[in-house]
């Protein structure tokens, strides 16, 4: 069973890396942001990737991708424990009290399901009241650190809420 969990974990990591490789495009810069999940504010390094686009299927809300290892020690204990069990291959049922939903991601590399919770994100370098993306979902992925060190990957929809002028075409 442990061997099966390890193999499933390896397949999962390859699938999520495929999400990033086939949906993602480089060229942006990492910026300071504050991600709020489960009533906990986390200061993070975010990266806006114009090729990343995932929505929570029931609400159609934008999803940001969070590297679990980068924020694991700062999460509320109940959420951290749930995510640890999920990434260990235990496949726990979503916890309604945490607002966990399972978000499907599909690429040419395959299909994976990511645990996600309601979230908001703001750029900490913007004036108060500006640059805030509300009503998002933060999907967690067990990924190694990328070369540029981002902790949260933001797609165009959430990116436009945070930096409204940066993404508009002339």
What is the meaning of each model-derived region?
Residues 1-8, 12:
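Single conserved hydrophobic/aromatic residue that forms the stacking wall/gate
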